[in-house]
Swiss-Prot record:
GO annotation terms (biological process): chemotaxis; immune response; positive regulation of cytosolic calcium ion concentration
Name of the protein this chain belongs to: C-C chemokine receptor type 10
Gene of this entry: Ccr10
Organism, as annotated: Mus musculus (Mouse)
Coiled coil: none
Cytoplasmic side: 70-80, 137-159, 230-247, 313-362
Length: 362
């Protein structure tokens, strides 16, 4: 009698874990979650479509600008910014599938479910890991104030780090790649992560811990440490570049605290409950579901804001973007005198040299 009990809600079709996948035992009371499901059906498609449009436009422009610049050498930060834009672009590509699945169910089969789920998970974790890489690059360039030639991170090493980040992200996405499938739920087909019954609770818990520690806690710690050290350095520095660099750091920290930290904490608490096999009351379970939904939506907004926070704030990127929009740009062949043609002189054609300074573009 009444409404049929519904599954535990998590963000999107691919993030979080289905109640059947991570079941730690029945709730102490029969729990009806029709109100949570109704909120999810309205909230998830709206956020997914908004982030998809903004993320595709912003990150697509970042990629186009970086590629159009045609530089033979790039700074480590530029390499990681390019990879961050790629990860966020791939993530944005999966969101229309999430919106459609939330509205009308999943009708693309289990193979597509696994592919889209894996792409979502890999790109989501890669984006967070590349944010940590950029934070470390900025610390080396600004806080330690080393010239480009003396920094431990070089473009070639940055490429190796990028390969490692993508491999780690694929590893973290293995559960989604292997165990996602479509199945009936509440009268509709759903793309969900469902572990086989043969897997023990320990294996499921280990998978969750690996994702939380490697995909969230580690980059979270790196970013927090680097930005704290950067803030201390910039507060003690003098000169006209200090205020601008400090504003950038403050903007990044505020965006991180508002958009990323709540979801990371909610996921940590949810994983702790999973490992402790705690039973929740119905009201507590609903609050947890709503927290994961809302904070998960906030962290997706991050991928559409990254181009503004990490690329558009850079002077070099804005110069490259201006040349791209004006249809200009350097010839791939260097000018014999090392100067720009007269018609492009005002576009600041030559790439700025990395120097010993507080500039955020280093």
């Amino acid at each position: 009698m009444g409404t049929k009990p519904t599954e535990q809600v998590s963000w999107g079709l691919y993030s979080g874990y289905d109640e059947e996948a991570y079941s730690v035992g029945p709730l102490p009371e029969l729990c009806y979650k029709a109100d949570v499901q109704a909120f999810s059906r309205a909230f998830q498609p709206s956020v997914s479509l908004m982030v998809a449009v903004l993320g595709l436009a912003g990150n697509g422009l970042v990629l186009a600008t970086h590629l159009a610049a045609r530089r033979t050498t790039r700074s480590p930060t530029s390499v990681h910014l390019l990879q961050l834009a790629l990860a966020d672009l791939l993530l944005a590509l999966t969101l229309p599938f999430a919106a459609a699945g939330a509205l009308q169910g999943w009708n693309l089969g289990s193979t597509t479910c696994r592919a889209i789920s894996g792409l979502y998970s890999a790109s989501f974790h890669a984006g967070f890991l590349f944010l940590a890489c950029i934070s470390a690059d900025r610390y080396v360039a600004i806080a330690r104030a080393l010239p480009a030639g003396q920094r431990p991170s070089t473009p070639s090493r940055a490429h190796l780090v990028s390969v490692f980040v993508w491999l780690l992200s694929l590893f973290l996405a293995l559960p989604a790649l292997l165990f996602s499938r479509d199945g009936p739920r509440e009268g509709q087909r759903r793309c969900r992560l469902i572990f086989p019954e043969s897997l023990t609770q320990t294996v499921k818990g280990a998978s969750a811990v690996a994702q939380v520690v490697l995909g969230f806690a580690l980059p979270l710690g790196v970013m927090a440490a680097c930005y704290a050290l950067l803030g201390r350095t910039l507060l003690a520095a003098r000169g006209p570049e200090r205020r601008r660099a400090l504003r950038v750091v403050v903007a990044l920290v505020v965006a991180f605290v508002v958009l990323q930290l709540p979801y990371s904490l909610a996921l940590l608490l949810d994983t702790a409950d999973l490992l402790a096999a705690r039973e929740r009351s119905c009201s507590s379970s609903k609050r947890k579901d709503l927290a994961l939904l809302v904070t998960g939506g906030l962290t997706l907004v991050r991928c559409s804001l990254n181009p503004v926070l990490y690329a558009f704030l850079g002077l070099r990127f804005r110069r490259d973007l201006r040349r791209l929009l004006q249809g200009g740009g350097c010839s791939p062949k260097p000018n014999p005198r090392g100067r720009c043609p007269r018609r492009l002189r005002l576009s600041s054609c030559s790439a700025p040299t990395e120097t010993h300074s507080l500039s955020w573009d280093n």
